[in-house]
Amino acid sequence: MASLRDIKAKINSTKKTSQITKAMEMVSASKLNRAEQNAKSFVPYMEKIQEVVASIAQGSKGINHPMLNSRPVKRTGYIVITSDRGLAGGYNSNVLRTVSNVIRERHNMDSNQYSIIVLGRLGRDYLKRRGFNIIDEVVGLSDHPSFTDIKDIASRAIAMFADGAYDELYIYYNHYVSKISQEVTENKILPLTDVASDKPTTAYEFEPSEEEILKVLLPQYAESLVYGALLDGKASEHAARMTAMKSATDNAMEVIDSLTLSFNRARQAAITQEITEIVGGVAALE
């Protein structure tokens, strides 16, 4: 049986741990609030650019652009969004397990059939250790990334599609549903075969021409899909970490309660033993 000193040390250690996890929970909650605002504020831009692209694509049958045209798929590109830090429950493991299974099933791990662009240190390390074909990576993104932070990697991913490095491009990330729920999501980025808007399209007059507008607008639209997924993923990351830290704090409090009960019982047993010894000594003197 553990001594009173050992139990007391465990109680103090667990209390310190619970204080750390509680602080991390509060920090994640604060970051989540801002991440939610970032994701929501970007939606109007995405909806408007989608509306304009849909207006051109649906209203002009003769327009031909490489980003709109499907071609035989010989190689597939994947963008995988993970985090740089852990302690976020299943945030990283869920999306990485999904991507790993998809690549094994679709490509049988043949590096000639797929390429991965990974965002996040944990995702990069996980995929590298297991021999997946990573062609580009980004680590060190802030908790609240700007469009500038992601533009270079998004532009490179789009350029590789245009150059024929792969024939389609998917993005995998954790979609933010609520503070306690995040879903691994697959979105097809390229080719842009589904740009129809749910809202009625507005008639626009384009200068100098619809073709020239598309040359500029389509890459921006594809980049916005990547950035929107990143913002969504960041909200999911903070929510997952907040939930994980709350669970850790709750578990720590349960351990403290159990250890406190054990401490009280051990102390009571020690006191009882001392009383018994005193009574026994007095009886021996009589």
From Swiss-Prot:
UniProt xrefs under InterPro entries: ATP_synth_F1_ATPase_gsu, ATP_synth_F1_gsu
Molecular functions (GO terms): ATP binding; proton-transporting ATP synthase activity, rotational mechanism
A GO BP entry: proton motive force-driven plasma membrane ATP synthesis
Localization per record: Cell membrane
Source domain of life: Bacteria
Membrane topology: Peripheral membrane protein
Function: Produces ATP from ADP in the presence of a proton gradient across the membrane. The gamma chain is believed to be important in regulating ATPase activity and the flow of protons through the CF(0) complex.
UniProt similarity note: Belongs to the ATPase gamma chain family.
HAMAP family: ATP_synth_gamma_bact
Protein name listed in UniProt: ATP synthase gamma chain
Source organism per UniProt: Bacillus mycoides (strain KBAB4)
Gene that this polypeptide is encoded by: atpG
